[in-house]
Amino acid sequence: MGLEKSFILFSLLVLVLGWVQPSLGRKPSVQDFKRQHMDPDSPPNSRPTYCNQMMKRRGMTKGSCKRVNTFLHESWATVKAICSQRQMTCKTSSRNNCHKSSSTLHITDCRLKGSSKYPNCDYTTTNSQKHIIIACEGNPLVPVHFDASV
């Protein structure tokens, strides 16, 4: 009887872990990338409130303030095409699934101001034209992670 209960409890535990684990170890997705980084319809602008508005609108100030984020002011086709560039090691990890843009892109960098604390997330807005490095996955390859701008 005790062995039977243990088996039932173990089976239940395996089921629960199988249900919970995918959300814990969730891989980055193309939808996350688009939400966090794509803003093709807005040209880069120097409005100091751009980052504050966009970070909040895109859900990056829920529960805490995301420290750094980059928005890309290019078409999805332009960004996706970077995945066809030569593969390289990522700058922020040892993964080897990154690709660097062959030309500079219009970007906006958002950086949390040093004195800013949740829930009042306050960002500096910096526009520039830089090469970007993104991680790509899947078949066909699609952007899933913004790695760096150089």
From Swiss-Prot:
Highest taxon, organism lineage: Eukaryota
Active site (catalytic residues): H37, H145
Entry-linked SMART domains: RNAse_Pc (SM00092)
Residues spanning the signal sequence: 1-25
Keywords: Disulfide bond, Endonuclease, Hydrolase, Lyase, Nuclease, Secreted, Signal
Main location: secreted
TM spans (from-to): none
UniProt EC number: 4.6.1.18
Disulphides: C51-C110, C65-C121, C83-C136, C90-C98
GO-annotated cellular components: extracellular region
GO molecular function annotations of the record: lyase activity; nucleic acid binding; ribonuclease A activity; RNA nuclease activity
Similarity-based family: Belongs to the pancreatic ribonuclease family.
Protein purpose: Endonuclease that catalyzes the cleavage of RNA on the 3' side of pyrimidine nucleotides. Acts on single-stranded and double-stranded RNA.
Quaternary structure (record): Monomer.
Protein name: Ribonuclease pancreatic delta-type
Species per Swiss-Prot/TrEMBL record: Rattus norvegicus
